[in-house]
Amino acid sequence: MEMDDSYIYVCGTSAESKKEIQVEELNILSYDTPAKPELVSRFHIIGQHVGESFAEGNRTNPNGSDQMITCHEIQKDNDRLYIAYRDEGVVILDITDPTKPVRVDGGYDYSPPFNGDPGLPREGCCPGAHTFMPAHHAGPLPSIAVLTDEHFNCPPGFGRIIDITYPRHMTLLSTYHITGVDDQYDFDKKKFVCPEGSQESAHMAEFDHRVKNGNLFYQAWYNQGLRAIEITNPFRPREVGYYISPDFGINVPGQKGRHTREPYPDWDSDLIYVTDGNGGGLTVLRYTGVLPTRPPIPGVR
């Protein structure tokens, strides 16, 4: 969900939605009268409504499972919405007039060739794109965005850096992963090997808006904690800090290990509030700078 002084932007179903699958769409509500919010417009992907058919590329994954085409995470930047739309990939909408949202991107849909989650269909989580976060920018529109997956199969979801200078022709610049999770490939068995007993995936990202050129962001990574990623060179993302919380061992049903989910930076206090979805509550952090390349040696200059 996102909101401004007059409107709320939220994913949800409608009377026209297909009932047998998860098909949330964008709903824009005016709350000029807070006691009586009013739906002013909607946006959906063709195929989400009863009587419609999905485009061929939005039907099945390479493993034969059904894709999930559903609105999930919304980011507002001036007069545009940047939406992670699960197996549809990403959507950019111009909301200069919120009652008439207009799609202005040419699509960036990577399922197929990737599965949203190779483990689906099953109970649990999750297909495809989770967060589509534009970087801080000096001009009227952003040129770089972070796109994260969310799925727990092996290999798990990871992150992408996207050039969105020309939204109708978005370009993948690089990907980023977590050492020890995404890089463990068994060449003899021809498959990835992932940690047991935990859920390993990227989740929500949030840029550090104190960095004026938008080159530092905080990436929640479930069992791998909070990671600070620097993209001064967007072709080569670099991890420059991390915080891995204790394993609280509470084990909410359906969850495994740490569940570092969302970072919420407060730029006035210079603090980052981080949530844990497996009973770990709220952790308050402060980013103090880049990790040293090696421990300092006393007395050496």
Specify the residue positions occupied by each region the protein language model found.
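Feature marking well-ordered beta-strand scaffolds used for ligand recognition
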Residues: 1-301
